[in-house]
Design a protein with these regions (language model features):
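Active-site-flanking structural segment that lines cofactor/substrate pockets
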Residues: 1-17
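Conserved PLP-enzyme active-site core in the AAT-like
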Residues: 2, 15, 23-196, 200-201
């Protein structure tokens, strides 16, 4: 509880879940997604393709237990050739089913630029202007502590990451975190049974 209070205070969020049982960033993202999406909901990525490791979680590549298998649909809007957001396409792809928007801060294995906190804030403001109740989640892996503010300071409802990377200083062998609104980090997210189930992904 003390460590989670420190994370919530550090990232200026209402709540935090920080556990060694969350084995890595992909596991933390899977836990956050599966705890906040239900059959009939839609997941939108407005910054292009996510990490390869998330493709089976989402169901872009067929996988047992994926979001797609449970009736969650997925839409993706690629960045424009100059790396800017395709606001017109994003607007077109937000609909009554859009429940969660995932924003990957790092460029990962893509050639696009890594997103600054300022740009993430602008994107979230645009999305919330269209659908205020949508959950905006930021994959914060590799982005922690490289700026004076975090995505949680500019409107992100959840930020998710790995303890193996920046927060662990290269020393932590395992662990992950989810920081954000209490409504996004509910009892289901904290369920040890649910966490164990996701360790197989």
């Amino acid at each position: 509880d003390t460590l989670e209070a420190v994370y919530a205070a550090t990232f200026h969020t209402e709540d935090a879940l920080v556990r060694p049982q969350i084995t890595c960033g992909t596991h933390a993202l899977a836990l956050a997604l599966m705890s906040n999406l239900r059959p009939g909901d839609e997941l939108l990525s407005p910054v292009g393709k996510p990490y390869d490791t998330l493709e089976e979680v989402i169901g872009i590549r067929p996988s047992k237990g994926s979001l797609a298998e449970y009736g969650v649909t997925y839409r993706q809007v690629d960045l424009l050739p100059d790396g800017s957001f395709d606001y017109d396409k994003i607007r077109e792809n937000i609909n009554e089913k859009t429940h969660l928007v995932t924003i990957q801060r790092s460029k990962g294995y893509q050639t696009r630029p890594t997103l600054s906190v300022q740009r993430i804030g602008e994107l979230i403001a645009f999305i919330k202007g269209i659908k205020p109740d949508v959950i905006c989640m930021v994959d914060n892996c590799y982005g922690e502590f490289v700026d004076v503010i975090e995505p949680s300071n500019v409107g992100a409802d959840m930020i998710v990451g790995s303890l193996i990377k920046n927060p662990g200083g290269g020393l932590a062998p395992i662990g992950g975190y989810i920081c954000g609104k209490q409504s996004c980090i509910d009892r289901r997210t904290r369920s040890e049974e649910h966490t164990s189930e996701l360790q197989s992904l």
